[in-house]
Amino acid sequence: MSDCSSSGSDEDLDPESELLDELGGKLSKWTNYIHGWQDRWIALKGNILSYYRSADEKEYGCRGSICLSKAVITPHEFDECRFDISVNDSIWYLRAEHPLLRQQWIDTIELHKAESGYGSESSLRRHGSLLSLTSAASGLSTASASSFKKAYSLQEKLAEMETFRDILCRQVDTLQKYFDNCADNESKDELHRDKVSDEEEDFPTLRPDADYLLNNNNSSKEKLFSVNTLKDPAGIDFKGEAITFKATTAGILSTLSHCIDILVKREESWQKRLDKEIERRRRAEDAYKAALTELKKKPHYGGPDYEEGPNSLINEEEFFDAVEAALDKHDQIEEQSQVERSRASRQISLTPDTFSSISTQKYLTKPHSHTSSLSSVDLISASDDVHRFSAQVEEMVHSHMTYSLQDVGGDANWQLVVEEGDMKVYRREVEENGIVLDPLKATHAVKGVTGHEVCHYFWDTAYRNDWETTVESFQVVETLSDQACIIHQTLKRVWPASQRDVLYVSVMRKILSTNENDPDTWLVCNFSVDHDGYPPSTRCIRAKINVAMICQTLISPPEGDKEISRDNIICKITYVANVNPGGWAPASVLRAVAKREYPKFLKRFTSYVEVKTSSEAILF
């Protein structure tokens, strides 16, 4: 039995035991729609897949784990580096650095999944057996008999068969040794017989008398006994070995019969299970078609498959619903913050000096403020505005003054999409390579404000956060001159659309009228440029814009000698926007969102300017 134990210890070092060791590596895991793909340390041990923030943080515990027993591993249809692991409603989206590494991960996970479910073939050899030579010799030993009562598994019976095999091999070797010794003794016996017959022929034939018999009796007996007496070869008990051999073979046949019984019972059991599964599948197939539609209505919207893109699994209607819900949420948050700001402003008490200062300076020209390098109060002309983008600025300004102020009629194919009072919004449908590039034009008339005031609050970044609700953050990258700067602006994420940013030159100009009867024009022009310090990032899609806010102030003379008040002025606004979103999104969704958001923007901004200037001196 020492041989058996030693062989068993060697089996424990089987290479398949390496599956019990922990395997790990770095993969990209989809976290959420805000942070996207993040590098995580993925660990695989047994049938448990865990992930950590990094390999150094393993000692603090895993951030999540799933059991692979019922997991479904699915390679992505389009992304060659991505694969998904789903267990019920839990889905892990993982990406490898290259397709070969992805396939290695999939093969390893599938192997661990199979090993955890059914065990390996070599595991049968690791089962110890309580059978010994003595128990085998008893035919049906106590352990073997009890195995029928306890219904030992097939693996345990196979382990017993291996034990019987080892015992039988040793018994065959013993019997073979016995027969070999018998054959050697037989050949020696024949040799002795030939030698004795030769010796008898050398002596004369005499009648043996008593003395001869007495004198030669002992030596003859020794020769006879030495030739005819057979000792057991090598001290082997042939009868005992035969009985043991018979018992071992009986044990093998008995165990084999039991294995066959187990297989038959399992076959019957599996047949019953198969029949049940066929019936379940028949019923499930009917429910599957109805459930499939319902499941599509409740997708895992946090997954990367439902982001914008030509391969997005979300249809246009659901895409629009998601965008509209996100915009409504943003509006609700903005309204709440506006209420809080207005409440805070009402709590600030105004001193008498403040009222007197407002009343005395109401109709005075506002002096230039040096607190902001982007202030535009003193801006009169752009003749001295020289910088590296001057040529592009002149080209953009000339283009807007030539084409943007033209009437929307004619062959321009402008479509009126929104009309609310004095505000009208027009659109021309343009698509290029499947990307919506619809130019938009809006006209509006606002009483009580001047074109200079509207352009001032639209251009000056000091007021940007007061009226702009779609901006997450912005930064003045470079100040080109007193009336021109470069701005990097990150827009708020509206899921499922990807987050976007813009990098543009913003310039404000006053265009003097060549006709005395026509008013002067104030213009703010924003157009996209490139900057070495702010290249496009993987976090956002870089959009391209060409936007202009063009304002003219119309003054109606006051009655008598009264001074011009805000009741006598009207600002005529023309707003044009050409936006390239930089990525694919459903055309119907973009147009519906533009139809909703542009009028809201104009109303919100002009209302802000009205409130901001109501107590200020008129800025012509």
Swiss-Prot record:
It catalyses: N-hexadecanoylsphing-4-enine(in) = N-hexadecanoylsphing-4-enine(out). A motif (FFAT) lies at residues 318-324. Residues 385-614 form the START domain. It is found in: Cytoplasm; Golgi apparatus; Endoplasmic reticulum. One of its GO terms (biological process) is muscle organ development. Keywords: Coiled coil, Cytoplasm, Developmental protein, Endoplasmic reticulum, Golgi apparatus, Lipid transport, Lipid-binding, Myogenesis, Transport. Residues 265-298 form a coiled coil. InterPro entries: PH-like_dom_sf, PH_domain, STARD11_START, START-like_dom_sf, START_lipid-bd_dom, START_lipid_transfer. PANTHER family: CERAMIDE TRANSFER PROTEIN, PHOSPHATIDYLCHOLINE TRANSFER PROTEIN. Interacts with VAPA and VAPB. Interaction with VAPB is less efficient than with VAPA. Interacts (via FFAT motif) with the MOSPD2 (via MSP domain). The START domain recognizes ceramides and diacylglycerol lipids, interacts with membranes, and mediates the intermembrane transfer of ceramides and diacylglycerol lipids. This is Ceramide transfer protein. It comes from Danio rerio.
